[in-house]
Amino acid sequence: MPQQSQPAPQPAPQPQPVPLHRARHTAESFGTDPQRYDRARPRYPDDLVARIVAGSPGPDVPDVLDVLDVGCGTGIAARQFAAAGCTVLGVEPDARMAEFARARGLPVEVATFEAWEPAGRTFDAVIAAQSWHWVDPVAGAEKAARVLRPHGRLAVFGHVFEPPAEVAEPFAAAYRRAAPDSPFSGQPARRPLETYQAGYAKIADRIRETGRFEDPEQWRFDWQRSYTREEWLELLPTTGGLTRLRPEQLAAVLGAVGHAIDALGGRFTMRYTTLATTAVRTGAD
């Protein structure tokens, strides 16, 4: 009898990556060393802060803007908005980061934005500095609309940094060797800016879907900063791919990057782009 052909084996389904807003272990790993985080992380362009303040909440700007900072961390952006004359309340899921921010004068309530209870409070602006990817994008946009006053502004922003290839490639290679099982190990040495711009465009889509905002705008601020070897090695452990490494893994990565910077003379110039998606809440409740 002729043999029946067997169906070809099907490849095992690949696990889908966990959305970042559900990756709570990573989201709450930044508080491991809040002092280093606050010391090393770059501030936001003054022009960005000024533009948000000037554009909130629209035709009836009060003397002092009430700003809600979602995922405020150690209060880097919040302090900049306070210096611009705003009253700022932080919401932060990591109690260690919240305590650091409180010690520097920022009132902070510990919760995820989705679970946070506004208790009837409303704001002229809701900002999220380098934090919106840890928030459910649909629930976050809906909640922002609920707590914003009519004509208030939602502003989601963050940095994209592009180290020179002489620094980025040794980092990526060392990371793959040190942490081959990490979900971050497969990322390219340098991700194109367009990748991040596409992410901010998706944020705009989620904002549109609420039907409670005017059409979102995309803002861009380009700038540069020079880093010494010590300054960059201070910042690297505060980034998401490194906050959960074991000490020996982290040491291996930092050693390779330090050697690469030494080969450049101990200093390099980082190109930054700060991207923002922002939208004004409609006047209708």
Regions found by a protein language model. Give the residues of each.
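Conserved class I S-adenosyl-L-methionine
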Residues: 2-63
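Conserved Class I S-adenosyl-L-methionine
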Residues: 3, 194-285
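Nucleotide donor/acceptor-binding cores
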Residues: 64-65, 121
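Class I SAM-dependent methyltransferase SAM/SAH-binding core
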Residues: 66-70, 74-116
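A short acidic, Gly/Pro-enriched loop at the edge of an enzyme's catalytic core
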Residues: 116-126
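Short catalytic micro-motifs in class I SAM-dependent methyltransferases
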Residues: 130
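A short, conserved alpha-helix within the catalytic core of class I
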Residues: 135-144
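Conserved catalytic/acceptor-binding region of the Class I
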Residues: 146-222
